[in-house]
Amino acid sequence: MAYLLKFLDIFRWKKHYGREWGIQKIFMDLIKERMNRIMSKVYIFFADGFEDIEGLTVVDLMRRAGIDIQTVSIKETKEIRTSHGIDLLTDRTFGECDFSDADMLVIPGGMPGTKYLEEYKPLTDLLTDFYQNGGKVAAICAAPGVFERLGFLKGRNATSYPSVMEQLKSARTSLEPVVVDGNVTTSRGLGTAIDFSLSLIGQLEGSAKAEEIAESVVYVRA
């Protein structure tokens, strides 16, 4: 950004000395357009055994919405195997990221994926710091249980997979497909993955964009 501002200063100097205003105006218009198109940045974390649909639905729909969502392996390699035996490569490993540009952090459910995510201290430290500084965090299925144990759900409305609900002792539990309370979003499971994804898109890009994506994939709400 500093480089761009310096470039604009050069153009202003040229204008002051009688050079073409048209070039400056075109350049400034391009910069404004580019700035208006800056994408939200989201990181979603995968461990072996994460639930396929819960994780990849978020990635698919966010990318359709123009959101820069990066898949992150908590292993030393990018190779991940889902809970149903699908092998995939993430965009990055955890160690390759600094997360300073994050607008939202997401963890999917699935077993044993959720257990591995919770056991990875660099991730729980990141989530805690991000949450405490007001960053948006989201979890689905078994993963809200991780948020409970990190203290994110105290006094909040939340939901989760049915068998995990009893773990959310500090929260006001709900049977809604998706629950948003402040900077925390929780959802119930595989069957609510589209609603979950659309809610996250709406929070980042507005309800109109979420509706646009819902229509584009012919999603019919019950």
Language-model region placement:
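N-terminal beta-loop-helix "entrance" segment that forms/cooperates
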Residues: 72-91
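Short, Lys/Arg-enriched N-terminal segments with co-localized hydrophobic residues
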Residues: 23-38
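Short N-terminal binding/cap micro-motifs at the start of the first secondary-structure element
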Residues: 50-54, 79
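Short, solvent-exposed amphipathic alpha-helices that sit
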Residues: 57-64
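Active-site-adjacent pocket-lining segments in enzyme domains
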Residues: 41-44, 50, 64-73, 92-222
